[in-house]
């Protein structure tokens, strides 16, 4: 578990980070006992740290008794260079795509073996969306994730291919199939998905380059891609090139 600390005599800082690390995309709200177990800390220690973090606004506690990440963490996260620089520079281009398509638009980067969503502009309510700005999703089941995975170091690709998880009946979980898809992404310059993360949602994404380096992925989520794929790819490429020029200064 991400937040687990089992070393005797661990510092206060490491214990605080163990508590914060207990939260993830699938564990957004935790009871005290769940928080204690996932952090690998004694219940009394967890209770004391959680109470202090609630007082500081780092955690919040619902009426149900569950703890969630507080607004202060989100506010601090927005100050990170990867958030402020890329997100702000890309914003006009994301809004241009959104205005032209009225579809959900994503800007994302890779963090380890997951997609980190820097921005999400929500489109049609008829398309199911599970992403959120600041949230993380698997690389292998999202359009932006496949772009980032295709251009990730070999070690990252190997780690992802060795632990593919089925999310819907259409999620690609055969390593040889995903490897072939990633090769096409590198060759064609874009990635697509269909019902792989959420049923009823398809996506298309392209890389954002700073020079020769892929620094992010830009994507759109729509009900289906059969008619508009090339038009959406063309629009995304124009926007990605614009972001790349701005990043290059």
Name these PLM-found stretches.
Residues 107-112, 121:
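Short hydrophobic alpha-helical segments used for membrane anchoring or interfacial signaling
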Residues 72-100, 126-129:
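Conserved segment of winged-helix/HTH DNA-binding domains
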Residues 125-197:
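Short, solvent-exposed recognition segments
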Residues 170-244:
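Extended hydrophobic
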Residues 9-13, 66, 70, 83, ...:
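Short, structured helix-loop boundary elements
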Residues 1-83, 230, 241-249:
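N-terminal helix-turn-helix
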Residues 59-60, 107-108, 208:
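A structural signal for short hydrophobic beta-strand segments in well-ordered beta-sheet cores
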Residues 88-100, 184, 188, 242, ...:
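Amphipathic alpha-helical regulatory segments at dimerization interfaces
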